[in-house]
């Protein structure tokens, strides 16, 4: 995998305002794309930029994901999505996105164990689902319950503490399938099914979605593989609307559950 060089310098761009010339750094991204660094524009000229919709503006540098939908290119941490989809499962890809590298066997086992430790949601949260109308939109339920996690798991809300943030990340990855499956069960009037930690990430999600207490459930391996592939492909999509929303809310030092809840609301829209 090639190293991530970050934003390299590529000369200067000259901007003239009222006869005064200001030089701005030109940077080059990992795929050879050029950008103009305007961080010092206002302090140097008193001017600001106007870019409605931020069509021409990159909000940050990142070494996580590169996406070019028109060319069919998607890379996580430099790895082509085709390689990851063939060689890894979703949990491995999640580790890669979070920690910046693929895990070794011991790291992967520890990560899987950390996730399995957090699959259940607080029992009192089950009552939330009784308060939602049966036809409630799944995104409304998802955003509400994720936001409410901050009231039940107050020991991991300090965004300045890396360990607490890590615990919140583990909790979100582990609990989101449970929250989503409970939403589905509510919509069809079936009992909520507890998670099973002896199953894989995708197998567990499918059994919570489709199992019923009165009969044994067997997960189709093809369904689990297809879901795994779907989660890998959609694991990260650069600086899209929901990602930008999470970053914006998080910039206020809001806890991770609140930030992700806001991102879910942004993802809800049809655009």
Question: What is each residue range found by the language model?
Answer:
Residues 3-271:
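Hydrophobic alpha-helical bundle cores within soluble ligand-binding/oligomerization subdomains
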